[in-house]
Amino acid sequence: MANTASARKRIRQNERRNARNTARVSRMRTFVKKVEAAIASGNKDEATAALRAAQPEMQRASGKGVIHANTVARKISRLSARIKSIVAA
């Protein structure tokens, strides 16, 4: 248990931040799942629209420091490549 007032305050801050960050990651994952579902259905237009909606959410999570910027770039790149492969097939 925290002994000092500042340590108790830090615990409160960490709990709030943890809840906020968890919500951000969850929201981002939901958007990514929508993109993956659209890719699985084979609908290129739907997948493109879903990626267009997911991209700002992913970048926002990166900007807030929830996940690393390179991770977001890699995920966006891989999703884009999968959408392009729908067109080629």
Swiss-Prot record:
<dbReference type="GO" id="GO:0070181">
    <property type="term" value="F:small ribosomal subunit rRNA binding"/>
</dbReference>
<dbReference type="GO" id="GO:0015935">
    <property type="term" value="C:small ribosomal subunit"/>
</dbReference>
<comment type="function">
    <text>Binds directly to 16S ribosomal RNA.</text>
</comment>
<dbReference type="Pfam" id="PF01649">
    <property type="entry name" value="Ribosomal_S20p"/>
</dbReference>
<comment type="similarity">
    <text>Belongs to the bacterial ribosomal protein bS20 family.</text>
</comment>
<feature type="region of interest" description="Disordered">
    <location>
        <begin position="1"/>
        <end position="24"/>
    </location>
</feature>
<keyword id="KW-0694">RNA-binding</keyword>
<keyword id="KW-0689">Ribosomal protein</keyword>
<keyword id="KW-0699">rRNA-binding</keyword>
<dbReference type="GO" id="GO:0006412">
    <property type="term" value="P:translation"/>
</dbReference>
<dbReference type="InterPro" id="IPR036510">
    <property type="entry name" value="Ribosomal_bS20_sf"/>
</dbReference>
<dbReference type="GO" id="GO:0003735">
    <property type="term" value="F:structural constituent of ribosome"/>
</dbReference>
<dbReference type="InterPro" id="IPR002583">
    <property type="entry name" value="Ribosomal_bS20"/>
</dbReference>
<protein>
    <recommendedName>
        <fullName>Small ribosomal subunit protein bS20</fullName>
    </recommendedName>
</protein>
<keyword id="KW-0687">Ribonucleoprotein</keyword>
